[in-house]
Amino acid sequence: MNPNQKILCTSATALVIGTIAVLIGITNLGLNIGLHLKPSCNCSHSQPEATNASQTIINNYYNDTNITQISNTNIQVEERAIRDFNNLTKGLCTINSWHIYGKDNAVRIGEDSDVLVTREPYVSCDPDECRFYALSQGTTIRGKHSNGTIHDRSQYRALISWPLSSPPTVYNSRVECIGWSSTSCHDGKTRMSICISGPNNNASAVIWYNRRPVTEINTWARNILRTQESECVCHNGVCPVVFTDGSATGPAETRIYYFKEGKILKWEPLAGTAKHIEECSCYGERAEITCTCRDNWQGSNRPVIRIDPVAMTHTSQYICSPVLTDNPRPNDPTVGKCNDPYPGNNNNGVKGFSYLDGVNTWLGRTISIASRSGYEMLKVPNALTDDKSKPTQGQTIVLNTDWSGYSGSFMDYWAEGECYRACFYVELIRGRPKEDKVWWTSNSIVSMCSSTEFLGQWDWPDGAKIEYFL
């Protein structure tokens, strides 16, 4: 074969191969078009929302993922999951002991990292996850602006949330709303957060729903409008929230607001025999919401508000048991008071909680009767109704040689199971006023959940050494 014949043969072969490749490409394109236009598709769907794979993994807000491959390019089409309002249909699980749930070691880590100064922490869950919440002071522990963070109210505070058991940092915290008093809860569809800000005599609350401001409430007594400092609870979209405006050492005006999708359905003044209400810790079960609160005026026993979210009504009383759970407090008496404050708190108090479930009742309190140190859980059957009830079992959470602080209840209402697992957190305050060699006041968090087993015990201190900050 001469050179010219070789060239012609090679060219013809290349032309045939090229033609075959073009035909394969046209066939592939036709098949893909046919698949996308096949009659069995559901063409009535609304316009889908496209996201990348990393959003699907992190947020977990979507389902029904369809992936079609065209020429090595992934096109991901997703639909937003439809969620319903959560209903409080279950009762509490039997509580025999408490296991560790979360601990952020924020002050220890903050000795050498950009950890935010916080206080008034809590835990709240949604259908996808549980997160830590707290009121930030707008500075880090090591920052110079941490000087003076012992003060509760300023223009620099904000409700933030961050992943469970991580410390709150500039990088992992999400701002929910701006203010120095807060509550937040998920109704099954989305989250409602409430923040209060402003001067003492003219504060106001902004109610956020689905990350947008929906409603505002102005002060009614012009004396530090304030709310729960832990999560609220929702039933069938109705989310009651307890507010107080007025004196911390005398009569005040408490209201229970009923919200749905961030809008006010109704509000009512405090009813029942409780004389003073602050900083309620709430939980829900069997279509009822129970809130254990703080009587800062007179009571060393804790007031309780029981709310019917269906009828949107409530009543109040005190925990009858002589096992007193506020701080400061006197030694436990022989007989408690159901409808009156038990004296001895010297116009002071601390946020606390309880699970009031007949023989399955547990009360939380500081171990010290004079200062915010130590923490223990006590099983006190029928504490709500029996004025002579006594502890039958206990578990130490924080030793009396270690600092504690506020405490409150929370539950994961979306966890699997036939009952709700009771959970709580304890604020571990460090810095001023007790440790005045440093200029700041902050905290870490430890949280526990109930077990039906009789588990071994351990204590859970904050663990930071103040001398490392000097």
Swiss-Prot record:
InterPro entries assigned to the protein according to its UniProt record, in alphabetical order: Glyco_hydro_34, Sialidase_Influenza_A/B, Sialidase_sf
Residue sites binding Ca(2+) per the record: D295, G299, D326, N348
GO cellular component assignments: host cell plasma membrane; membrane; virion membrane
Protein name according to UniProt: Neuraminidase
Post-translational modification: N-glycosylated.
Pfam families tied to this protein: Neur
Chain positions recorded as substrate binding sites: R119, R153, E278, E279, R294, R372
Upper classification of the organism: Viruses, Riboviria, Orthornavirae, Negarnaviricota, Polyploviricotina
Topological domain ranges for the Virion surface compartment: 36-470
